[in-house]
């Protein structure tokens, strides 16, 4: 359920730093990574909107511009590898620049 926090969830926050923000291609990259994990993964924008990280439409609906902070919430077993892969993706500025 989208409004229910995950039990024993691990969270981490990343900042969008590319000029164009999270448009279609970065959204697809986020979904591609999230889809490799079996557990639930949610993303929350600072304003409180929470979406499934495996949904490209959900990620795009966040309209995350440069400087937006996105908080990922996942199951503990997925946490170390998911955080590493997402951190690397965000650090690469989604290969936009």
Where are these regions (language model features)?
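C-terminal structural segments of small proteins and small subunits
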Residues: 63-97
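A short alpha-helix capping/helix-coil boundary motif
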Residues: 8-11, 39
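Compact, glycine-rich, soluble single-domain proteins
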Residues: 15-65
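Broad gene-expression machinery/nucleic-acid interaction feature
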Residues: 11, 56, 69
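Generic structural detector for well-ordered beta-strands
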Residues: 13-15, 73
């Amino acid at each position: 359920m989208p409004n229910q926090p995950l039990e024993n969830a691990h969270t981490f926050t990343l900042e969008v730093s590319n000029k164009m923000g999270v448009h279609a291609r970065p959204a697809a990259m986020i979904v591609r990574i999230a889809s490799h994990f079996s557990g639930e993964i949610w993303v929350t924008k600072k304003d409180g909107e929470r979406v499934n990280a495996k949904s490209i439409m959900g990620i795009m609906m966040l309209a995350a511009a440069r400087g937006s902070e996105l908080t990922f919430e996942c199951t503990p077993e997925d946490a170390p590898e998911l955080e590493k892969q997402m951190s690397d993706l965000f650090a690469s500025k989604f290969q936009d620049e």
